[in-house]
């Protein structure tokens, strides 16, 4: 459990409308459940059009986890277009494939993780800002991925990392320097993530 109350925990608006872009992942509705504690939610599949996304006129967008690689349109659908065309104006949170897509959409590279991880918790070191405001250092984050952000574009700061057994640092969070885009590689909605509700609440409190 979190040992610190996140900054802005009581500041979530009661009229928020959050749109999920579902990358066909079993975790999507766990995320929806978390967000539904604070906001009205709507889910569209990544096969939706950009017009569909814009027509919803959300206060925020969450890009779900999912299988595949962001270079493949069949895996991410409208996700990259959302990141490039909508997210500069609409606060956006990417999770797992959502992070990989954000990095890829802005010119970064995505490679293979040193080892595939599915359902293990790792300590997350972070900068204490944005979705990490008020959270303890080294909280346990549930990881489920075989890809990793290898080269993060200059438009982003690396906001969170974890280390492998040999000391290799892996990107676990990014934040755009100008646009309201944040993303995490771990899964806030996993039972393995000790502060998952706090991460979501911090994102919503920042709207």
Curated annotation (Swiss-Prot):
According to its UniProt record, the EC number is 4.1.3.27
| Swiss-Prot/TrEMBL keywords | Amino-acid biosynthesis, Aromatic amino acid biosynthesis, Glutamine amidotransferase, Lyase, Tryptophan biosynthesis
Q: Does the keyword Lyase apply?
A: yes
Q: Which GO terms describe its cellular component?
A: cytosol
Q: What does it catalyze?
A: chorismate + L-glutamine = anthranilate + pyruvate + L-glutamate + H(+)
Pathway participation: Amino-acid biosynthesis; L-tryptophan biosynthesis; L-tryptophan from chorismate: step 1/5
Q: Which residues form the Glutamine amidotransferase type-1 domain?
A: 17-207
Query: Per UniProt, where does L-glutamine bind?
Result: 66-68, 146-147
Molecular function, one GO term: anthranilate synthase activity
Which residues are catalytic?
Answer: 96 (nucleophile), 187, 189
Q: Which Pfam families match?
A: GATase
The lineage's top-level taxon is: Archaea
Q: GO:BP terms for this protein?
A: L-tryptophan biosynthetic process
Q: How does it assemble?
A: Tetramer of two components I and two components II.
| PANTHER family xrefs | MULTIFUNCTIONAL TRYPTOPHAN BIOSYNTHESIS PROTEIN, MULTIFUNCTIONAL TRYPTOPHAN BIOSYNTHESIS PROTEIN-RELATED
* Miscellaneous remark of the record: Component I catalyzes the formation of anthranilate using ammonia rather than glutamine, whereas component II provides glutamine amidotransferase activity.
Name of the protein in its database record: Anthranilate synthase component II
Organism placement in taxonomy? Archaea, Methanobacteriati, Methanobacteriota, Stenosarchaea group, Halobacteria
């Amino acid at each position: 459990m979190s040992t610190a109350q996140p900054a802005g925990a009581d500041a979530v608006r009661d009229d928020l409308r959050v749109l999920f872009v579902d990358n066909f992942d079993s975790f999507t509705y766990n995320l929806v459940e978390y967000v539904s504690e604070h906001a009205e939610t709507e889910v569209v599949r990544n096969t939706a059009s950009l017009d569909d996304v814009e027509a919803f006129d959300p206060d925020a967008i969450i890009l779900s986890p999912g299988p595949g690689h962001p270079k493949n349109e069949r895996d991410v659908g409208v996700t990259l277009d959302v990141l490039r065309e909508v997210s500069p104006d609409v606060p956006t949170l990417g999770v797992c494939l959502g992070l990989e897509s954000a990095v890829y959409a802005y010119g970064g590279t995505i490679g293979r993780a040193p080892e595939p991880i599915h359902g293990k918790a790792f300590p997350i070191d972070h900068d204490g800002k944005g979705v990490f405001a008020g959270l303890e250092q080294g909280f346990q984050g549930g990881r489920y991925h075989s890809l990793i952000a290898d080269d993060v574009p200059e438009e982003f700061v690396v906001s969170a990392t974890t280390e492998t057994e040999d000391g290799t640092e892996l990107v676990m969070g990014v934040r755009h320097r100008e646009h309201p885009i944040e993303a995490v590689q771990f899964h806030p909605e996993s039972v393995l993530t000790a502060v998952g509700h706090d991460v979501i609440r911090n994102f919503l409190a920042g709207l």
